[in-house]
Amino acid sequence: MTVATGDPSDEAAAHPGNPAEYDPDADHECCERVVINISGLRFETQLKTLSQFPDTLLGDPKKRMRYFDPLRNEYFFDRSRTSFDAILYFYQSGGRLRRPANVTLDIFSEEIRFYELGDEAIELFREDEGFVKEEERPLPDNEFQRQVWLLFEYPESSGPARIIAIISVMVILISIVSFCLETLPIFRNDDDEPHSVFDTNTNTTIYFTSTYFTDPFFILETLCIIWFSFEFLVRLFACPSKSGFFGNVMNIIDVVAIIPYFITLATELAEKPEDGQAGQQAMSLAILRVIRLVRVFRIFKLSRHSKGLQILGQTLKASMRELGLLIFFLFIGVILFSSAVYFAEADEPESQFESIPDAFWWAVVSMTTVGYGDMVPTTIGGKIVGSLCAIAGVLTIALPVPVIVSNFNYFYHRETEGEEQAQCLGPVTKEDSNEELKKSRSGSTISKSDYMEIQEGVNNTIEDIPEENLKTQANCTTLANTNYVNITKMLTDV
């Protein structure tokens, strides 16, 4: 038991525990209360609660002093009442921020900016609201490389960058159109395949190939590849990270779009048909056609400049689980109904279903409701199986579609409303604070002249007030607050 000595009215002496460890200032601050008036609704909290976040508007004594009403001995804010419950809970809970259900996102975002809760609180709020955190886009350290990187990677950064993006899109479209037109019969040159002529004078076979390098489509393709290669090499030179550059799917597509040209070029230059090698040349031509087919992937280069294609790619990526389930269900249905229709048509002499693998095509076409009609059941049992197959296909495809559509809507709205949300959650500016201060003043019962006098006195004396006095300003009520009268008198006398 601790025995108190001296004056029994001394609170410090009567405090239980070790008297040397007792801090009366801490106990004094713990008891101080702050009254905050939000558009007529009064809130009361302890000073130490607000002091947990000294960089915010309510936590900084100098910042909140601008809104002090000395006649009412309270802080007045002409702000949203319903939002302040969550703002005050932010201080009481140590940093947890939850938007009330009856407050819209834009209004609550404005309140966060006004009370200057900080970037960390905004990020936590965005995560709680379900916003996907935007990926950081590093820029090169070198100034020249940074300008080049912005020029080729971010079309919205400047006018020249927009022009380069337009040129790139036009070249991609020209390349795709050329790829399609060269297959038309009037443009197709069937002399690409090697042919031979027997020379009776030398008793040898001479192989000929077409003049590939004089083909107008080859010249047009060469011009497109020059631009693609130039663009790729410049972006590779200016990129901030080489490993990150080659890890990007879009850059891999760029490489895939360029490589077939050089493989084709090398094959044409190295091709020298000799006697007995006609079969190898035919095989080489087949491989070459497959390589040329890869050129069609250039169409994906448009996704670099198209938000719609990017949204589609994000939707497919987010819906991989649903797409996998769809393919799995289709696989089960194909096996089940192809087996059923085969045995249902087994006794039919003119049946088109000669085996279960032959019926796979019919099952896929029926379940996807395409119905080419090249394979049809003729027996009653086969028609029943076909009907069940079509119904099962409709149900199987329809089930995961709403989930995929929901993902698409999410990414679409996130992309279209991203800029507006970023503006709502942007940092508060000095002009915004001044405007909010004017609104707060206009809603007070004190006259304009009185406010000007009080504000002038606050501005002239706030820097001279010691920090410990700011902690015990007029609005705070304690068991023994000796600074209350002095500060009130100072503000009202000005």
Swiss-Prot record:
Region (S4-S5 linker): 307-320
Record: glycosylation sites: 203
InterPro entries: BTB/POZ_dom (IPR000210), Ion_trans_dom (IPR005821), K_chnl_volt-dep_Kv (IPR003968), K_chnl_volt-dep_Kv1 (IPR003972), K_chnl_volt-dep_Kv1.2 (IPR004049), SKP1/BTB/POZ_sf (IPR011333), T1-type_BTB (IPR003131), VG_K_chnl (IPR028325)
Expressed in which tissues: Expressed in oligodendrocytes.
Cytoplasmic compartment segments: 1-159, 239-249, 306-320, 413-494
Ranges annotated as spanning the membrane: 160-181, 217-238, 250-270, 285-305, 321-342, 384-412
Side Extracellular, residues: 182-216, 271-284, 343-356, 377-383
Role, per record: Voltage-gated potassium channel that mediates transmembrane potassium transport in excitable membranes, primarily in the brain and central nervous system. Prevents aberrant action potential firing and regulates neuronal output. Forms tetrameric potassium-selective channels through which potassium ions pass in accordance with their electrochemical gradient. The channel alternates between opened and closed conformations in response to the voltage difference across the membrane.
Protein name: Potassium voltage-gated channel subfamily A member 2
Organism of origin: Oncorhynchus mykiss (Rainbow trout)
Gene: kcna2
